Amino acid sequence: MNKAIVLVVIAVVAAVGISSFALTSINSDEVTPLVQELAVLEEEISILGTTNPFSAPTTIAQSMQAAQPAPNVTIGDDGKIYVLYQDTVNEETNIFLKTSTDNGKSFSTPVRVNLLDGNVALDGRVAPTIQLGDNGEVYVTWANSRYEPNMFMGNYRQLVFTQSFDDGKSFEPSIIIGAEELASGKYFQHMSIDGYGGIHMAWLDGPAKMNATGYMEKDESRDRGVRYVQSLDGGVTFDTTKLIDANACPCCNVQTAADGEGNVYISWRKVFGSGDTQVRDMVVAASTDGGKTFSGPVKINDDGFQFKGCVHVGAPMAIDSEGTLHVAWYTGATDHQGMYYATSTDNGQSFSEPMPILTGDWVPPQRIFIAIDNDDTVWLTWEDATGLSTNEKAWRYGDTQALIFTAQVIDGELIRADNPINESDAKSLTNIDSDNGLVSIVWTETDNSVKIAIAEN
């Protein structure tokens, strides 16, 4: 691909309070030793500034009734843009898909993805995931929710999957992932597709059981943690789910990545130790056999983030044409808190020295996302809530405002735009994607609109 246009999709929605502390105590587990040094300070690396290349955003969709806090985007090999967004009317949340074939200048009429009305959990922390097949297939997964008074925060979530065989013009009836297995709540899910059309999902799993009153409650006899499942027939059937790790932060995002060489990666925030001194650092587990088996967790960096709670942010990943794994993440470690970027050239067995993206004495927990274009240029986008956070110095992703910045990594240098691309305070950045000369970014802001902006590179 010749990188010609950078496309930004901005889903601008009313800010909603979505986070709360989830204090837990989890025993430590073994982890593969780390081989790199701690991150260097920001001023010690080359950071080149550039002007913001993005045009003013234009509106794709508008909601006046309720927030739609978790949009998502993907781009086809032909440059067609697919934008998912949620809309809530009369307390019923549904997912809609719009597409564009002219680089975002115009979009199709919306198609509702979920056939069962209101079968969607409204959660700005976790966007519905969309992936594309090679023959007009569109795959979407999300979580639904029902009231269960004995479960954490009173809700029980299931993982829902659907597919379209006509390029998103219509969708099939959805299925529940793991419906034939023992009951468990599924949270902070993510889905990837590999080069052969294999579908890979991972999530945080909370085993549950029915009690004598007819309500669900935690099942303490089974391990909670990160679980994984795959489908090798385009979502017609899914394998039995498998436990990847039992010592995961119970409310930080899980991320996946897969390529056409049999490599599948899962990242999550793992808990080491217990009590007030426990550490919650980002790790990656790797499979080189298409998801049949996975390595033990490897720390991306030995951050040593001591925190007995959840920051609600994960470590998104992308794989370039040479098979290098690229990852970005947030840490609240006292001596180097902020957002970082690193790579692995040995299938996740070790990681490079982290490159600081945003650091400071206080960096609120915010999201960072990553994509790689067809020229293997790395694109990063992140929220910067410095001075805007309503969380003060609480390590959690919560109800705050943020500015959205972008950068590229070229030949080891960070080329960062000097100005944010959003016109208003953003809320809940959810994805970045690239293909066919386009790079698309989606996030939420404060006026309930879905917008798009384009910049030529």
Locations of regions flagged by a protein language model:
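Positively charged n-region of N-terminal signal peptides that target proteins for export
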Residues: 1-4
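Extracellular, repeat-based ectodomains that mediate carbohydrate processing or recognition
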Residues: 7, 13-457
